[in-house]
Amino acid sequence: MFNMNKVLELTLNHGRCLLTDKQMASDFGSLSTYKTFADLEIALEQTMNYFVEKMIPCCEAVEKGHIAILPTAFLSSVIDDCMEKGIDVTKGGAKYNLSGIQFIQVANLADSLAVIKQLVFDEQKVSAKVLEEALKNNFANQEILRQKLLNHVPKYGNDIAWVDELGVKWARKFRAKLREFTNYRGGAYHMGMYTVSAHVPMGENLGASADGRLSQTPLADGGMSAVYGRDLNGPTAVLKSVSRLDNNLTTNGGLLNMKFLPEFFQTQTGIDK
């Protein structure tokens, strides 16, 4: 899994982790030093590319380790070509030798970028320096600012095209970068969007984010789902937002969680909604 929100955190903070102050990436600047939103995006892409290039050898090491310590005989028996070749799936016996990498987490990423774009650069209603310091201090004594981030900017999952497209844009950039690599079996890397329950530990490794999320709290669940409580325009709007993430972005699978109380369907009004 690739935590794109951590990449954004580092891009906004001189390449340093908000939790440990460790230098984890190149220093392209900080939120208060980028002159335009485009400048921020250039730095974000450079940081993303750096970590993708670091990630691929790690994935290869894990997959090669599986050959030695975790062969999968039963799985291989139901995968095309493994039985015919007499080669375990971990060794490249499958007809299609893809590897999957999950892009985490599109909702928080879109929401954070939307806040920065609208409030900091377009409307200039929030000072870049003030927001930068608030993120470093987990919004201590800045609850009014946090509520502005949460409530004054539209969020992913409400069928608001420009917000959704921020997430789509970066999912496409990530997929394009993955396509530069093949795994050690000669197969392609395919992108997915699902976390199952990993959005919790992924969030634990993040400081506060520009969408108003507090430090070390969970990210949006699922993988394509909106952040809890931010999908305000109903389930159809959620589906329309998710539909902008075309299937080519989730060839390794995508997960949308939508949860309804049973009482929701007990009235005609609820059903109509």
Regions found by a protein language model. Name each.
Residues M1-K273:
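Acidic, glycine-enriched catalytic cores built around paired aspartates
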